């Protein structure tokens, strides 16, 4: 193997640049040419490639986002689109591919490996932390700390005005980010897709808190909670606004709603995300050099591991209900 490609796909996550840096410099260390592919699978189809060197990734380890840019690509989901990508890769001489992204990105990597015959390795980069076969994904720790920092700021004004704040976080199908940020941020209530809840119970808990002398409350809500709430993504009809309105009606408490949105994806990655990305990027290159394909690099029990991408996609990562219980106990 003489030349490999690297791309980022799907939603960006802090630490992706650190992973790109690691792939490029590890590849060069092993005598490989490393080609950067801009805009994910769209760039793969269009041949938007450029040869990277050590200088290409200088001064990026601390930067959020991705220097390779990211985009969603419907065309790659078609056989015709994938054949275009294969033609471009063969013309460029790309013999292996590193894909940094979430589950959608990994489905593409699986197609590259199994259908197109190009070895591909996946690095989990998503703030949702919703991929199986790894304890942590790149970007999760940074996003969690961003939420916690925001909660701290919200508490200041919430206390001053004796208000309840409903704060919506990302997590359409997964509550990992919301749960862990809620536990670390001391949220009074945490609502996630995986665990049923009753707003009457939530409201009673809030009222009891105020009766004990609490001056404010923070309710953290994952964007994918309950079918009983509006699914219209217009900000004025967000589930968080529906929940906030119902809580205000049930409790009589002055309630405000905040949608954190894309702020959770930005910012300089934490040390943990930089280290995780650096280790995973290097491991991905080593796997390609060992003639591995259709594998994902994971991190389990403080060690790097590998698993089949198909296994990571087929398994559903479960939130720890003991952690959810602990968060409820500590918030009482």
UniProtKB/Swiss-Prot annotation:
GO terms for molecular function: 6-phosphofructokinase activity; AMP binding; ATP binding; fructose-6-phosphate binding; identical protein binding; metal ion binding; monosaccharide binding. Its cofactor is Mg(2+). ADP binds at residues 21-25, 155, 186-188, 212, 214-216. Keywords: Allosteric enzyme, ATP-binding, Cytoplasm, Glycolysis, Kinase, Magnesium, Metal-binding, Nucleotide-binding, Transferase. ATP binds at residues 11, 72-73, 102-105. Pathway: Carbohydrate degradation; glycolysis; D-glyceraldehyde 3-phosphate and glycerone phosphate from D-glucose: step 3/4. It is found in: Cytoplasm. GO terms for cellular component: 6-phosphofructokinase complex. The keyword Isomerase does not apply. Its EC number is 2.7.1.11. NCBIfam families: PFKA_ATP, PRK03202.1. Belongs to the phosphofructokinase type A (PFKA) family. ATP-dependent PFK group I subfamily. Prokaryotic clade 'B1' sub-subfamily. Homotetramer. Catalyzes the phosphorylation of D-fructose 6-phosphate to fructose 1,6-bisphosphate by ATP, the first committing step of glycolysis. This is ATP-dependent 6-phosphofructokinase.
